[in-house]
A protein has these predicted regions:
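Short, low-complexity intrinsically disordered segments enriched in A/P/G/S/L with frequent Arg
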Residues: 4, 18-20, 24, 32-35, ...
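Proteins enriched for Cys/Gly/acidic motifs involved in redox and nucleic-acid/cofactor modification
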Residues: 48-296, 335, 350
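Conserved SAM/AdoMet-binding glycine-rich loop
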Residues: 166-168, 175-177, 280-366
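Short, positively charged and aromatic/hydrophobic N-terminal segments
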Residues: 2-3, 11, 41-45, 51
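Short intrinsically disordered, low-complexity coil segments enriched in acidic
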Residues: 1-4, 359
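Ser/Thr/Pro/Gly-rich low-complexity, intrinsically disordered segments
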Residues: 9-12, 17, 23-24, 50
């Protein structure tokens, strides 16, 4: 079996559910939750005006618990240094293979940043890599099959180099049944962690090296925000900037809320500083990322929304263009359109992931 690296991003298709998930469904008021539910984090919140069920997060968001403390992030930089020192005589080589959406691409750039801080150089050949990271997608069945096929192919590289560390991360890794399948059937995989644990990748990798054991970090968490992670951006023209994580919509066909957690917005000052830095570095096209950017700021509790963020970013001096994705139509506003129309730097395009034009189908899709 040959390893086949992911050449192109997987495109998310409307209504495609991928494989069925395992686990107990949550019920309340005689209603059943949307398909794909395997977490106790959600609950039935009544009905819409058309009697379709409403679903929401069971526990209110606590911003204090979402933000990863600076001292915990500093510890991760210490683990990076420790790993670099452990391999000072022969620096590690790493390969990062990304499946899925632009958010996964942005996550992989942070993974590469952390690996670079550990002293790693990069290769596209898994046979030459000391650390192999597969950042996975749980949206499409085809992408999952590619991941499992590549995991199987990596048994040969592991036999040739028993010291090789194989890591599985991303949305697939957050699913409990996937983690268990890897634990039982892919015993050459050393580290499995979901998107919620991305920020502590250095610590998890250090545990693999020092404790000589397999490490799994797929806790059922609401999600977090970690600022200041290292990043390696590919190219010098386009940059991805995550402005929020997770999703509060429970579309019946979509797994994202269950693997990415609830919506949580980054502080606007952090985003503005990051974009200002990218413009100063010469980046010309900056894409703001979120599962639903139009709901940015709702969890901040300061009366600051996505239109306010775009208006603030537009004030940055320089030659650049701002794009954003994805946009949920129900959360768009005239204020947003007015800001876009008056902006010097926001692209005259609105990304709308249209799923159907039929009200009945849309209701069935929640």
């Amino acid at each position: 079996m040959q390893y086949t690296p992911q050449a192109n991003f997987c495109q998310i298709t409307a209504g495609h559910t991928g494989p069925a998930l395992q686990g107990a469904a949550v019920t309340r008021g005689g209603q059943s939750p949307p398909p794909l539910v395997f977490s106790r984090r959600i609950c039935y919140n009544g009905t819409n005006s058309d009697s379709t069920p409403l679903w929401g997060w069971e526990v209110p968001l606590d911003r204090a618990q979402v933000q990863i403390p600076a001292e915990q992030l500093a510890r991760q930089r210490d683990f990076e240094t420790k790993i670099r020192d452990m391999h000072a005589q022969r620096p590690l080589r790493a390969m990062v293979d990304t499946f899925g959406c632009q958010q996964n691409v942005a996550d992989s750039q942070h993974i590469m940043g952390m690996l670079e801080a550990m002293g790693c150089t990069f290769t596209d050949d898994p046979a030459q890599a000391d650390v192999v990271v597969l950042n996975t997608c749980a949206i499409r069945d085809h992408a999952e099959k590619r991941v499992y096929g590549n995991l199987g192919a990596l048994t040969h590289t592991k036999k040739a180099n028993p010291q090789q560390v194989i890591c599985l991360c991303g949305c697939m890794a957050q699913r409990p049944e996937v983690a268990e399948k890897v634990r039982q059937s892919y015993r050459h995989v050393d580290l499995v962690f979901g998107p919620q644990a991305l920020w502590k990748f250095p610590e998890l990798l250090y545990q693999v090296y020092t404790q000589r054991r397999r490490v799994f970090s797929v806790a059922d968490e609401h999600g977090s925000i970690a600022e200041g992670m290292p990043v390696v951006r590919e190219g010098r023209t386009r940059a991805w900037v995550s402005i929020m994580y997770g999703c509060n919509n429970f579309c019946s066909y979509c797994i994202v809320p269950y693997v990415r957690g609830r919506e949580r917005s980054r502080d606007p000052e952090r985003i503005i500083d990051e974009v200002r830095g990218l413009v100063a570095e010469g980046f010309k096209e900056i894409t703001l990322l979120g599962q639903n950017v139009n709901s940015y700021g709702k969890d901040l509790g300061i009366g600051y929304d996505f239109a306010d963020l775009l208006a603030a970013l537009d004030q940055i001096e320089g030659d650049y263009l701002i794009r954003f994705m994805s946009s949920q139509p129900k959360d768009a506003s005239h204020k947003l359109f007015d800001v876009m129309a008056a902006s010097r730097h926001v692209a005259r395009q609105l990304h709308l992931p249209v799923q159907s034009g039929c009200d009945r189908v849309l209701r069935a899709m929640n």
